[in-house]
């Protein structure tokens, strides 16, 4: 059955307008993006098939062009549209944390750091630099590693902090395995960084580890 023949309150577009985007399933949101189905398959059915094929919405959105375009009902035009949507989402989050803004929402910081690091195939260590009123100065990616480790050097972190005259920092790194639980090495290097920055009177407000689920906060664990 075509979606236009469904009851109005069950159609994805109308449902979004009436109840908001959060009320829609992954398949319904994807169907709105797809707009149309293929022969013998409406947009909702196509969306469900794609989610089953890729395993998750995140896997579909993160697919490389060749893999994406091999899927039934998708092609280069849809890939371009999708990349544009994803980039707009990243820029929205970046604007929310643009230079000069105070950090008033811990959840926004989590979302921003997730967007920057979660799907990286290799480990990346980065930090948010803040002034003495906790306004954002800069987001810096500092160290890049292998699939399971990145070498981190406290001296280079200190140099970066001094260069930008930061008064506080938020550290972050990803675990490409998807498991966000901090390792013993993560805790050890964080202690070394805190000790180094304490010598120049700069505070480490938090250290987030990014994985598949919610980021793990060192501050919430009482480790800072």
Swiss-Prot record:
InterPro entries noted in UniProt: MPN (IPR037518), RadC_JAB (IPR025657), RuvA_2-like (IPR010994), UPF0758 (IPR001405), UPF0758_CS (IPR020891), UPF0758_N (IPR046778)
Residues that, per the record, bind Zn(2+): 173, 175, 186
SS bonds (residue pairs): none
Keyword annotations from UniProtKB, A to Z: Hydrolase, Metal-binding, Metalloprotease, Protease, Zinc
GO molecular function, one term: metal ion binding
Span of domain MPN: 102-224
Keyword Secreted: no
Segments carrying motif JAMM motif: 173-186
Pfam families given in the database record: RadC, UPF0758_N
GO biological process, one term: proteolysis
Family under the similarity heading: Belongs to the UPF0758 family.
UniProt protein name: UPF0758 protein Tola_0183
Lineage: Bacteria, Pseudomonadati, Pseudomonadota, Gammaproteobacteria, Aeromonadales
